[in-house]
Regions:
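ABC ATPase NBD coupling module
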Residues: 20-36, 65-69, 179-183
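Conserved ABC ATPase signature
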Residues: 88-92, 96-98
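Helix-to-loop junction immediately C-terminal to a conserved catalytic motif
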Residues: 3
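ABC ATPase "signature
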Residues: 173-174, 182
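Short coil-to-helix segment of the ABC ATPase nucleotide-binding domain corresponding to the Q-loop/switch region
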Residues: 48-56
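Conserved ABC ATPase "signature" region
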Residues: 18-19, 55, 59-83
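Conserved signature/switch motifs of ABC ATPase nucleotide-binding domains
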Residues: 87-90, 108, 115
Length: 285
């Protein structure tokens, strides 16, 4: 829908201040040229070398052969494949083929790069290298990158903002750290709350989610709380994350059954540099 190859049944699509549904055919074609796209499958032409694959969209646009090859070699340098210009796709690894696809998508100097599940077919090590490349492209070339993924780790690694979609509708929008710290929608909570056998948790118990960020992620907040408040708690789940280069951690605690002890624990957490809230629905998320 962002490229308007698929027209939405309702609503509008606005890209760079232009409402695509109101553009003429010629204007829409020009708008699409400002968008590059990579997919889960690399879709390289098998009978063309890496260099020739990158030149292909430039040839279609009427760019001279010399200028197209010059641009393609510049892009091969950017994606770290300057020594693979004459290799065919069958001679490249999956990660290298995706790098060629990225270079091809950048050939026309787009303002926006759309990444549709671009790392889903790659192993974890290659995924990290591709994400690092995309992050560098965003930083050095100033291109807006829109990532479509079901992997929260990808969002945490390279994105500044996130829109969570549930049943074809946007359930929540915000910066990645805002959504991680204070998820509001049920879908966001499913994605962000620590994994675990939630069904094994007793219903009717009180649970608290604590989020640590920055330096506070390294402080012994829970142990200090137990000592200070004399309120023992059970740590049900915990994990840590790196979101856009910043350390975050979260815990799900089972609060004491004694009401006064539970209130002391929550009051103490409010005085610390952490976000804490009761999550009565945690066991059922």
């Amino acid at each position: 829908c962002i490229t308007f190859l698929e027209k939405p049944a309702e609503g509008t699509v606005t890209v760079d201040g232009q409402e695509l549904g109101k553009l003429s055919k010629k204007q829409l074609l020009e708008a699409r040229r400002s968008m590059g796209m990579i997919f889960q499958q690399f879709n390289l032409l098998q009978q063309r070398t890496a260099l020739q694959n990158i030149c292909f969209p430039l040839e279609i646009a009427g760019t001279s052969k010399a200028d197209a090859e010059k641009r393609a070699r510049e892009l091969l340098e950017i994606v770290g494949l300057s020594d693979r210009a004459d290799n065919y796709p069958s001679q490249l690894s999956g990660g290298q083929q995706q790098r060629v696809a990225i270079a091809r998508a950048l050939a026309s100097n787009p303002k926006i790069l759309l990444c549709d599940e671009a790392t889903s077919a790659l192993d974890p090590t290659t995924t990290r290298s591709i994400l690092a490349l995309l992050k560098e492209i965003n930083k050095t070339l100033g291109i807006t990158i829109i990532v479509i993924t079901h992997e929260m780790a990808v969002i945490e690694e390279i994105c500044q903002r996130v829109a969570i979609i549930d049943s074809s509708r946007i359930a929540e929008v915000g910066t990645v750290d805002e959504v991680f710290t204070r998820p509001k929608s049920a879908m966001a909570k499913q994605l962000i709350y620590p994994d675990g056998k939630r069904n094994s948790l007793a219903t009717g118990k009180r649970y608290c989610r604590i989020v640590f960020d920055g330096n506070s992620s390294f402080e012994p907040v829970v142990s200090n709380m137990v000592l200070e408040c004399k309120a023992p708690v059970n740590i049900m789940f915990a994990d840590t994350k790196n979101i856009d280069g910043k350390a975050y951690g979260q815990m799900i605690l089972q609060l004491p059954e004694d009401e006064r002890a539970a209130k002391r624990a929550l009051a103490y957490l409010e005085t610390q540099n952490v976000h804490a809230e009761e999550v009565a629905d945690y066991a059922s998320v």
